[in-house]
Amino acid sequence: MSLGLYLHIPYCFSKCRYCDFYSAPGQRGVPTQYVDALLRELARFAPEAPLHPDTIYLGGGTPSLLSPADAARLIAAAAPAPGAEITLEANPETVTEQTLCGFREAGVNRISFGVQSARDSQLKTLGRPHTARQARAAFAAARRAGFTNISGDIMLALPHYTQAEFDETLELIAEGGATHISAYLLKIEPDSAFGRHPPEGLPSPDEAADFYLYAVEHLEHHGYRQYEISNFAKPGYEGRHNLIYWDCGDYLGLGPAAHSCMGGRRFYYPSDTEAFLNDKAAPVMDGGCGAEDYLILQLRLRKGLDLAAYKARYGKEFSTAQLAFVKNCVKSGYATFDGSTLALTPAGLIVQNSILAELL
């Protein structure tokens, strides 16, 4: 069984207007004390032997605010398995060729850039601190540093969005050498700046769905195969870490607001950086990973839900009513079903929540 290790780096120079993820001010980068706290927790979960994770994901926040030396300390302490995928999320304005070379030497072999848009006016609206020029420079620097596994994030259905904006952003990322692209529909979260003050020019739900289907089609045309609702990859470059999540595998998350699922049990750290630093933030148990979780997560994937595996793992079978609903989904173009595997089409992924409401 694969093990994924997530290390949360909560520090950010500034908060993006759409973001409601837990973060902490980081004008001076990532404190050494915080890295020491992560190392403390690593030792706590592996007191006798290293974890040897199959994937490590340095997420945030802004993990590229780490020094390469501190990234090396964390990776060395985790003692990843041979061939492990080791990802670092990065904001384009925070990296140089020198720091990227340092991360590469530290053991990072996959870099993920938060691009979002190729239009500077849109980036300003989103509260992103980089420019399109800096994004292009970051991709070029990553290639020179030796990275061959590069991901880029695109946001869809932004204020005053057009297909032309998507095309420009895809061109920037594809020409930058990306082997993987994550494309997310903007969601207005209540606790974000956009939630408190919604921007003008937001697309309607139907328009957002059209942008999503347009993105799927054009990403496929450029060689990025959809393997999950929001993720697309060149062959062999699917994100291995997130696949552990979607396959309900074991993963350990360390840091404030980080979540874990180990041996079928979920737990998380409180969203309190100060408490984490001072060793006063014990993990909180959060129930188990059950059949419903598995069904929900498997139907995010284009490969779909294998009913035999579902039964073998949880002793669950679809009822006559559920199978009848599945057949209606197939007729409507929302799903494919060959009697053994149920998979949602791109049109079905848009209305996944409604489909799940009938299946759960």
Spell out what each predicted region is.
Residues 1-9:
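Immediate flanking context of iron-sulfur cluster ligation sites
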Residues 347-360:
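Short, amphipathic alpha-helical interaction segments positioned at domain boundaries
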